[in-house]
Amino acid sequence: MSNFWVIALNKNWATLDQVKEAYYYDDVTKEELKEGVDNNLITPEQYQEIVGEAYTSVTLSTE
């Protein structure tokens, strides 16, 4: 399940600035934001704006 702030940004219940502030106060984690990108709730661009670094997808090898 995603964090409230991830869902709020997706539903336009919160602004990007509000989510950035929530991130600053540890109300949403980098991992929760990555999960939001992975689940198409937020964009990689929004992730980068909030966290201050580019989103990198992690793919697991099955070898």
UniProtKB/Swiss-Prot annotation:
InterPro entries: XkdX. Pfam families: Phage_XkdX. This is SPbeta prophage-derived uncharacterized protein YomP. The gene is yomP.
